[in-house]
């Protein structure tokens, strides 16, 4: 996916993988997220002082993790015995590791915003590079994804454990996960969180991570999304030069776990120190369906930050605090989420009734005729603003690829939305929002006595080589690039 945009001598680079937490094995949730972290650790070519000496130690560590996860959680003696071996050998292996070589190399290219993220159906690796560094960046990324080496793994566990513990303490995260669990009692959207379950986090498998990488990180399941100042023909040749030898494998398959219709209200309570709040959600069909398009319009009728029914009738009238709604369009299913907080003296149940009352207004058509046209104008303006930045354009590419929507259809989305009438929205609301087909999560203020914690095992601090450099880094840094020619404004 390429779009040339000569706004500045920069290029936004997003490498997207059509795989996320929904693709995790049932017995190893959190795996996609672990892998994202490990893709910053290097390969057999960089990130190591001597890979031939490092590899036998890494192989031992991988085998020990398999032994560790096979031991019952209650067998603390044997688990501690094996963990002590993992910790000890990891310290030896770390003596060969060169820390942060990937970050050093992209920084040397002049990259900004280096990052990555994992969600339920995608993993995306991000950089913003100078336009004269495209070839070096392509060379580096091709090497990065050729054969990643999962070194310094047990210290990375500590980072992931801390992420999990923060999530367990976060009221918003608890509400969100409870909402997904209620809406998707079968599908992985609700049953496999991105971070993973505590038992699986405590029993990680490097072997399973490698299997996941080999299955999903293949050229026919990945997309290079570039937006910026570059020449199309030259860039395509460079992509072919550095990525052309990647082996195409069988297209990964995913079996969608079908959900039965929701026929009675699903209520859940979560507890925490923050102010009371609620989430409410309805389930719909997935991306690139008529559901997803009319859902987008219905959501804007209800809440658009200024003239939606919730905005006018509830927020501006001070009937509740911070009410609103949002659509979440995913590949297999979508959801329409609602939220709000009570004002003093008000209950969460009253907040729920107020939000539902605005859905009833949509069903009755009690919104102005001009609102539908105004929503289209607002969506068009948002789209124009998004496409004015390289990051916005690259993100559009990612969305189309992940949702498996042909680019021409993705670009035609606004034209399809324009066809939707007020009556379509009224009919949609009456057909899909009833008094018994939603999930509601009440966030109560109080101590959450059910919060578990991920207890961190003993991890001995490791000594890594921070100043050393691999031959690959030295070679890459010595490669010359053309200087960027300044462009002066002509007044």
Question: Which residue ranges define each predicted feature?
Answer:
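Short, surface-exposed beta-strand/loop micro-motifs that present aromatic residues
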Residues: 1-5, 114, 210-215, 263-270, ...
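Proteolytic maturation boundary segments
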Residues: 2, 231-271, 276-277, 281, ...
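M16 family metallopeptidases and their MPP-like homologs
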Residues: 3, 8-24, 30-31, 48-143, ...
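Active-site recognition of the HExxH zinc-binding catalytic motif
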Residues: 29-41, 300
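Peptidyl-prolyl cis-trans isomerase
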Residues: 41, 45, 94-101, 108, ...
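Alpha-helical secondary-structure segments
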Residues: 139-143, 161, 295
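Non-catalytic, conformational "gating/processing" segments within enzyme and secreted inhibitor domains
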Residues: 154-158, 172, 176, 206-242, ...
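Carboxylate/His-rich catalytic cores and anion/metal-binding grooves
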Residues: 161-173
């Amino acid at each position: 996916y390429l779009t040339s945009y000569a706004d500045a001598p920069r290029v936004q680079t997003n490498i997207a993988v059509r795989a996320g937490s929904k693709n995790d094995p049932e017995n190893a949730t959190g795996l996609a997220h672990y892998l994202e972290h490990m893709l910053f650790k290097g390969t057999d070519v960089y990130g190591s002082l001597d890979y031939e000496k490092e590899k036998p130690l890494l192989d031992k560590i991988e085998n020990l993790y398999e032994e560790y996860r096979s031991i019952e959680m209650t067998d603390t003696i044997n688990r501690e015995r094996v963990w002590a071996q993992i910790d000890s050998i990891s310290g030896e292996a770390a003596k060969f590791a060169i820390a942060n070589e990937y970050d050093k190399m992209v920084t040397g290219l002049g990259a900004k915003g280096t990052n990555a993220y994992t969600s339920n159906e995608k993993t995306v690796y991000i950089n913003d590079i100078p336009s004269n560094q495209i070839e070096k960046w392509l060379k580096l990324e091709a090497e990065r994804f050729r054969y990643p080496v999962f070194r310094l793994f047990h210290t990375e566990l500590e980072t992931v454990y801390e992420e999990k513990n923060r999530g367990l303490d976060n009221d918003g995260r608890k509400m969100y996960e409870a909402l997904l669990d209620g809406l998707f009692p079968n599908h992985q959207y609700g049953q496999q969180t991105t971070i993973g379950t505590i038992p699986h986090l405590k029993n990680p498998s490097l072997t399973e991570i490698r299997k996941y990488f080999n299955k999903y990180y293949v050229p026919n399941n990945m997309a290079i999304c570039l937006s910026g100042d570059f020449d199309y023909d030259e860039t395509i040749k460079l992509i072919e030069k550095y990525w052309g030898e990647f082996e195409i494998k069988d297209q990964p398959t995913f079996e969608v776990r079908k959900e039965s219709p929701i026929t009675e209200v699903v209520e859940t309570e979560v507890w925490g120190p923050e102010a009371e709040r609620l989430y409410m959600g309805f389930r719909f069909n997935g991306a690139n369906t008529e559901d997803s398009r009319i859902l987008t319009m219905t959501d804007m009728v209800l809440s658009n930050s200024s003239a939606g029914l919730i905005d006018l009738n509830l927020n501006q009238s001070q009937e509740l605090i911070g009410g609103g709604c949002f659509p979440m369009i995913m590949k297999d299913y979508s959801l329409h989420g609602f939220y709000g907080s009570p004002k003093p003296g008000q209950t969460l149940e009253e907040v729920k009734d107020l939000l539902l009352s605005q859905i009833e207004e949509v069903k009755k058509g009690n919104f102005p005729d001009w609102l539908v046209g105004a929503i289209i104008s607002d969506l068009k303006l948002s789209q124009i603003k998004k496409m004015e930045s390289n990051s916005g354009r690259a993100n559009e590419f990612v969305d189309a690829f992940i949702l498996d929507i042909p680019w021409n259809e993705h670009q035609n989305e606004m034209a399809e939305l324009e066809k939707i009438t007020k009556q379509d929205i009224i009919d949609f609301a009456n057909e899909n929002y009833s008094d018994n087909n939603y999930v509601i999560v009440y966030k109560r203020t109080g101590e959450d006595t059910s919060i578990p914690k991920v207890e961190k095992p003993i991890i001995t601090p490791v000594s890594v080589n921070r100043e050393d450099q691999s031959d690959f880094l030295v070679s890459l840094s010595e490669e010359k690039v053309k200087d960027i020619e300044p462009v002066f404004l002509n007044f």
